[in-house]
């Protein structure tokens, strides 16, 4: 049983309100956490961060095979109080038993669900969140985040849906995934023109694919992204592929995506 934040700012959207109409996706609830400023000024609107594996991003010390959650709600609140980032709305979209099929954006085998999942996020979840909560709806204020396969699909959606998203954080991206032609995500990046997209990448150095992550970062630089202006890469020496390490690094992603230029530098 997942332990969710005990706060009046935490909301659960019942799956019946956001029923997926695409590609036989499994229904699921969605979790929304408002910033403290939303209680102080009811007219104010806020940027939104859509997080994959959204059941794992909260302050549950026991979930995720004992590693604990990301504590993203507490981290965002603290960074906002310190003036290191603007207040944002967090949206957690849980994974399902079809996680691999929903989060794999390349056709590595039949019946992939990443395209229906992207449509579901934009046309169902985002539309409902924008109607119900005080969001800034435009692409400038809409971002994605995820880790492992969740980071991979977040990065892919940011590229494929530039009219909706302008920022993305990919922690420990599962860049080892290849399509049927053995094409990697590194090659996907090398084939792209530079976009108006701010990208945060990171990885650990212990069984976390750091060599491939370096190649992805270098590919972005080769295509015109500017270091620390458009793209940031952090390598966590001794970091592993788990929620504890993602929790420890999450603040870097939040500051890069939602902090001022001084904070990013």
Question: In which residue ranges do the predicted regions lie?
Answer:
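Non-catalytic cap/lid and distal C-terminal segments of serine-dependent acyl enzymes
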Residues: 1-265
């Amino acid at each position: 049983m997942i332990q969710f934040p005990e706060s009046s700012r935490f909301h659960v959207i019942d799956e019946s309100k956001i029923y997926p109409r695409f590609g036989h996706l499994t229904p699921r609830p969605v979790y929304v956490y408002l910033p403290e400023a939303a209680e102080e000024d009811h007219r104010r609107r806020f940027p939104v961060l859509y997080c994959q594996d959204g059941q794992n991003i909260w302050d549950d010390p026991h979930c995720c095979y004992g590693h604990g959650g990301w504590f993203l709600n507490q981290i965002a609140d603290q960074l906002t109080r310190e003036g290191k980032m603007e207040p944002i709305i967090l949206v957690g979209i849980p994974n399902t038993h079809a996680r691999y099929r929903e989060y794999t954006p390349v056709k590595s085998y039949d019946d992939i669900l990443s395209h229906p999942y992207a449509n579901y996020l934009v046309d169902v979840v985002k539309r409902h969140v924008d109607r119900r909560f005080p969001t800034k709806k435009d692409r400038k204020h809409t971002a994605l985040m995820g880790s492992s396969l969740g980071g991979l699909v977040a990065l892919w959606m940011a590229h494929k849906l530039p009219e909706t998203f302008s920022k993305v954080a990919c922690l420990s991206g599962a860049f080892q995934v290849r399509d049927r032609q053995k094409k990697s995500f590194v090659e996907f990046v090398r084939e792209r023109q530079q976009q108006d997209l701010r990208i945060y990448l990171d990885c650990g150095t212990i069984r976390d694919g750091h060599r491939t992550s370096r190649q992805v970062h270098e590919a972005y630089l080769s295509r015109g992204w500017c270091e620390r202006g458009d793209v940031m890469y952090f390598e966590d020496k001794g970091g592993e592929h788990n929620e504890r390490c993602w929790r420890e690094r999450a603040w870097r992603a939040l500051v890069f995506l939602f902090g001022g230029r001084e904070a990013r530098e």
